[in-house]
Amino acid sequence: IQSDWGGTRIEAWMTVSAARKVLPNILESDPVYDEQNRTARLYNAMICPLTNFTARGFLWYQGEANRGFDGYARYMQELASLWRGRWGDAEMPFYFVQLAPYTYDDAEGLSLPLTVEQQTQALDLIPFSGMASTTDAGSEYTIHPPYKIRVGERLALLALKRTYGYGALIAQSPRYESVRFEAGRAIVRFRTDGIMGPQWK
C-alpha cells in the first residue's frame, strides 16, 4: 500500500499531540505552510483510512522538507510509535531512506549532513528500524537519486533479512563509529560493515 505526497513535512503525517511531544508550541494550522503540510493533515487523510488493513511494516522516505531541524530524529521516533500504535504492534519494522547527496541552497551547506546525522540517530531511538544508505546513489545536480534501483534493493534487503528471516543476507550499510589521526592518515572505525556501491568495493 503506497501513501505519499512529495515535498511534505513529517509533521503532516502525525497527530498534533505526537508532534507536540517534540515541539510543544507547534500550531495545528500554521499559515506559513501549504495546506497539505499542516500538522496532521496527511495523517488524517492518508494514514488513518489504512489502519484497518493488515500491514507487515513501514517504509519511510522523507526528510528534505525538514532539513536542518535538530528535532527530526525525535519526530521520526514519535511517528514510528504513533503508526505502530494504530496498527497495534509495537514491533512493526520501520525502514527508512537516508537523504541522498544533493547541493541544497543553504549558504553553509550543512542542512543535508545535519539531517543525515538526525536520521542516523533515529536508528538508535527506534527499535526494529533500519536505514537504506544513499551516499553512493545520489547526485549533486538532482534532488532525486538517479540510482533508484539501488535504493529499492537496499530497502528490500533490510526487509528480507530482518523481517522475513533471510539471515545470510548483508543488509546494512557501513556505519561510522570513530576516527583517529596518526602519521598523516585518518583511520576510520565502523560499527558495521555492509553493502556498498560498486565504486567503493
Task: State what each model feature region is.
Residues I1-K201:
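Cell-envelope and extracellular/periplasmic
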